[in-house]
Structure formats: C-alpha cells, structure tokens
Amino acid sequence: MKIQNKKTYLAVLILVTIDQVIKIVINNNFFDKISPILPPLLYFKPMFNRQYSWLNSMLQLGVGKYTHILLVAIMSILIYLFYKYLNKQFGTNKIINIMYAFIFSGAMCSLIDKIFWNGSLDYILVNDFFTFDLKDVYINIFSGLLILSLFLKNKVLNQIDDNIVKDFTKYILRKL
C-alpha cells in the first residue's frame, strides 16, 4: 500500500473516531441540553433520528433498519472498490484521496450509527427545519469537493470518460 493511501486510511480512522467520540460525549453529558450557536439559524439540540436516513425521515417511507444497513454496506463497498479502481487506473491523486477520506468516513459513521446507535445522534439544528451531525458534514464536504473539482477540471477527473461505468463494472466482476 502506498504511503499516500496509508495517510488516507489514517484520515478515515481519525474522522470516524472524532464523529463517534463527539456522539458518546453528547449522549453521556449533553443530551438534554439546548444551546444557541448562531441564533436564530443554528442551535445545539441533540436528538436521535430513528428513521435511519434523512430521506426516509422527510418522506416517511418506513424503510427499516436492516434495509438501511444493507444499503449503506453495499454503498461502502462500492465506494471502496471505486477508490481502488481510480488508484489503479490513474494512480494516487491528492484530491481523490481527500474526497475518498470524507465520503468513506461518512459511510462508515452512518453504518456505525445504524448498527450501534439504532439511528443517528444528530445535534446541530438548522432553522428549526432539520438536524445533522458531523458525518453529514463529511458527506457534504465530499460533495463540495467533487463539484469544485469538476468545475476546476481536475486532471484525474478529466481523464474519467463516459466508459467509466462499463470499465468499473468489469473491474468489479474481475474482483469476484
């Protein structure tokens, strides 16, 4: 494993640890507390989201825990395999490693939340509309970096063409 990839996996471990330690501290010491952060927009207001995903919660879809665990596990595997594929096809790239660290950390935190917390301990309330946690920030950082990279035409991302889905599918099938 290349040094850059080792740093990426260390970053994943650190990001997941930070997310989970924050949740443990909040659950044990601050769960019943409400504090303004930037009133009237942001508040610290911990709550458990037992709907397992934002989409399931907002649309009241009723999709259960084990279905969510399976979906997140499959997505995590696909994210991992796609990262390995990009490294094999294009070599290591700093922005790809950073993006992977955030999206894979978000996926791992989501999986941990569903398995061990029976949902997500969210704690930042936005405008009395929705509540989020650090894992959601990780996923949004990934999304922002992806958009920025596409906008700035990152050289590795520019090499990715219309055949990537077909090539990635072949890569996965060879792994099986």
Put a short name on every predicted segment.
Residues 1-176:
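Alpha-helical transmembrane bundles and membrane-interface segments of multipass inner-membrane proteins
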